[in-house]
Structures are given as C-alpha cells and as structure tokens.
Amino acid sequence: MNFYQIKSPLTQITEEKTAGYIGALSEAFGEEFKRVSLEEYLHDDFSLLYVASGGSEGYFIEVFEQLKDKPCIILTSGDSNSLAASMEILSFLKQHGAEGEILHGSVTAIAERIRSLRNAYRAKAALKGKKIGVPGLADAATVV
C-alpha cells in the first residue's frame, strides 16, 4: 500500500515515530506500506495521503492543484496535531468541490477501512467503461 506523507517543515516528529505507526498499520493490514513521491502518488490508482503533523495544511494547499482530481484518503496518526491538520485539509477539499475522507482511530479499524476502500476502488476501476443492463424488463435501462 502506497502513501504520500506530508508534514510541516517545522515539526519535530521523528522518522522513528512515523515508522512505528506505519509499521503497526502495515501489520494490521497484512501488507507493507511504502512511502512514495508525489509523482508516484499521483499515478497510483489507490494510495493514501498521510498527514504526519499539524501545520501540514499549508503544504497541502501548495500541491492541491495536482491532487484535486484524485479522491484524498487522508491517514492520520492522531499525534503531533495530525488530526487537526487533516480536518483543515478535508474542509479545504470540501470548499473546493473535491472528495476526501479522514481515516482515524485504532490501527485495526483503519486497516479495515483501507481494505474496504481499496476493494471499492478496484471494483469501480474494473467496471469503468462497461455497460450494465437489467435483462427481462420491458423498458430495461442501461447504466453507464
């Protein structure tokens, strides 16, 4: 599972603390989480945006134009004002007509939600461009 990490340049959050949280989440999910570049994040069909600290919303606004066409699944650890920054980012997304969701809670609950979201995105991608009809009805409509 890929994630793009944003954090305030002023934060004192350590790589060890981030690695500990991401490691616990990887274990609960049953798959390794890999930090990727912004370019990799943008080209991945389904990946997470990890808000590692408060103050990250300023950086997010700087890269928003690149992200606006992709739903933002925002992962928060709850440490270092991560949740507050995530809420600011979600509010910004909503104000600009973009999609987003904050994942917050126990690592087990977050892992389950990620699994559900990824399955939904995979199903949506598999159905993209397909025509689905309802056979047997006199006025069966085709859903595009």
Language-model features, listed with the residues they occupy:
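An N-terminal assembly and electron-transfer interface module characteristic of large anaerobic redox
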Residues: 1-144
